[in-house]
Amino acid sequence: MTIISVTLEIHHHITERDADRSLTILDEQLYSFAFSTVHITKKRNGGGSLNNYSSSIPLTPSTSQEDLYFSVPPTANTPTPICKQSMGWSNLFTSEKGSDPDKGRKALESHADTIGSGRAIPIKQGMLLKRSGKWLKTWKKKYVTLCSNGVLTYYSSLGDYMKNIHKKEIDLRTSTIKVPGKWPSLATSACAPISSSKSNGLSKDMEALHMSANSDIGLGDSICFSPSISSTTSPKLNLPPSPHANKKKHLKKKSTNNLKDDGLSSTAEEEEEKFMIVSVTGQTCHFKATTYEERDAWVQAIQSQILASLQSCESSKSKSQLTSQSEAMALQSIQNMRGNSHCVDCETQNPKWASLNLGVLMCIECSGIHRSLGTRLSRVRSLELDDWPVELRKVMSSIGNDLANSIWEGSSQGQTKPSIESTREEKERWIRSKYEHKLFLAPLPCTELSLGQHLLRATADEDLRTAILLLAHGSREEVNETCGEGDGCTALHLACRKGNVVLAQLLIWYGVDVMARDAHGNTALTYARQASSQECINVLLQYGCPDECV
């Protein structure tokens, strides 16, 4: 039966209602007949190549009769081959009725790994909701990629990613990740008692440390820590439930597969699906996944990349790239200070990371734990990767590990300090006890003065050790206490009057008000100019002190 007879027979029996279905049948028969004819021709000629069959249907008739018979056998005997070819071509490649309208978009997303030639291949990518930084706080879809170079990039759409435009990047080397309503990633609310040969004797102290409220929040009798990240393997996510998880449990709903454009959901669901990336500058980016599982996968991948990038990155500055020989000597002098040849918390040799407000050096593993404490307690910076302005170099050169430990471990009560062989969990227990809970902090000196007045005297006397001890014990209100007798000066005024940039910088980190004025209406900047201390001037301007001379 020829193609013409097949066509006439089918069109003779079809109705207008079944036109679409019959045309599909016609397409299938045309394709089957064409393929069988080509196969016969190949066998008759003793073989031949059939690769790229779709290109064998020409848009115009061929000049060779033999080629015409091979290429378009279904229409070789028809008086109007071009029309028939056009019909067959359009029907074969026309999408069927009821096809998925998102098919094209899904195909693009499924091949996203092949998009963006020449760029770093993402180790994780997908659509997330990101909260805008504007006052409306709306959630918008972003296409997010995580690359092995330690950079998280987000785009307005998949199309922008393909074109590599309208992107914003987050450097994970100077960032940390947080999940609202969760304990720190290395902590869990309940676990078996710790009985290790390497125990540092903190179990009892940790049980007694500020745990009187545990019975009120349902945590049980104690809190202990469980391992989640080792120094030799990539970190694994271990996010224990929030202390209020039981109260929210009945509010949780099953996750859906579609992103919610309006971001409206129950409070508990929002809490569970969100995570935040906080940079060292304090900038926070809020993201939200579609499901809890997707959120956990992103958090684990980002945490792994933070650790991996810190471990694998090399110094971006060599000795020849230092701005001056004096800067190189200053950094070397920091490393040569007493106690700075070993990590302040675990005694690992040759530490390359620093905590600015503590004035200490530490190893890379302890720096990760310090970073999780937040910038309020520890401002982590790399000796090799970051820039070191003169005021920061002076802070580090004035304190050092020995002086800091005489304060923060002043009453350690014979506890065994972690060593290089200690597990990460033992190091974290020690660090949190030392800086967060202040278990080992040296006691305040006996004096009739209040802490705030004592701090003012120590600043006026430029007694750095006493000032650090008082700042560690003090509150923001005590740090901002003013001199009596109507003077109105804060400790920052006194530090700038002396031109002491180390005390000025420490006071700012511990919460002193840089906008405060004394009884004469002068800010600390006025006293810094009177003392001709350009370093104090730079620090004050950096933190927003009003410059009335401009």
From Swiss-Prot:
<dbReference type="InterPro" id="IPR001849">
    <property type="entry name" value="PH_domain"/>
</dbReference>
<comment type="similarity">
    <text>Belongs to the centaurin gamma-like family.</text>
</comment>
<dbReference type="GO" id="GO:0008270">
    <property type="term" value="F:zinc ion binding"/>
</dbReference>
<feature type="repeat" description="ANK 1">
    <location>
        <begin position="487"/>
        <end position="516"/>
    </location>
</feature>
<dbReference type="GO" id="GO:0005096">
    <property type="term" value="F:GTPase activator activity"/>
</dbReference>
<comment type="function">
    <text>Putative GTPase-activating protein.</text>
</comment>
<keyword id="KW-0677">Repeat</keyword>
<dbReference type="Pfam" id="PF01412">
    <property type="entry name" value="ArfGap"/>
</dbReference>
<dbReference type="InterPro" id="IPR001164">
    <property type="entry name" value="ArfGAP_dom"/>
</dbReference>
<dbReference type="InterPro" id="IPR038508">
    <property type="entry name" value="ArfGAP_dom_sf"/>
</dbReference>
<feature type="region of interest" description="Disordered">
    <location>
        <begin position="232"/>
        <end position="270"/>
    </location>
</feature>
<keyword id="KW-0479">Metal-binding</keyword>
<dbReference type="InterPro" id="IPR002110">
    <property type="entry name" value="Ankyrin_rpt"/>
</dbReference>
<dbReference type="GO" id="GO:0003924">
    <property type="term" value="F:GTPase activity"/>
</dbReference>
<feature type="compositionally biased region" description="Basic residues">
    <location>
        <begin position="245"/>
        <end position="255"/>
    </location>
</feature>
<keyword id="KW-0862">Zinc</keyword>
<feature type="domain" description="Arf-GAP">
    <location>
        <begin position="328"/>
        <end position="448"/>
    </location>
</feature>
<dbReference type="Pfam" id="PF12796">
    <property type="entry name" value="Ank_2"/>
</dbReference>
<dbReference type="InterPro" id="IPR037278">
    <property type="entry name" value="ARFGAP/RecO"/>
</dbReference>
<keyword id="KW-0343">GTPase activation</keyword>
<feature type="domain" description="PH">
    <location>
        <begin position="121"/>
        <end position="307"/>
    </location>
</feature>
<protein>
    <recommendedName>
        <fullName>Arf-GAP with GTPase, ANK repeat and PH domain-containing protein 11</fullName>
    </recommendedName>
</protein>
<keyword id="KW-0863">Zinc-finger</keyword>
<dbReference type="InterPro" id="IPR036770">
    <property type="entry name" value="Ankyrin_rpt-contain_sf"/>
</dbReference>
<dbReference type="Pfam" id="PF00169">
    <property type="entry name" value="PH"/>
</dbReference>
<keyword id="KW-0040">ANK repeat</keyword>
<feature type="zinc finger region" description="C4-type">
    <location>
        <begin position="343"/>
        <end position="366"/>
    </location>
</feature>
<dbReference type="InterPro" id="IPR011993">
    <property type="entry name" value="PH-like_dom_sf"/>
</dbReference>
<dbReference type="InterPro" id="IPR051282">
    <property type="entry name" value="Arf-GAP_GTPase_ANK_PH"/>
</dbReference>
<feature type="repeat" description="ANK 2">
    <location>
        <begin position="520"/>
        <end position="549"/>
    </location>
</feature>
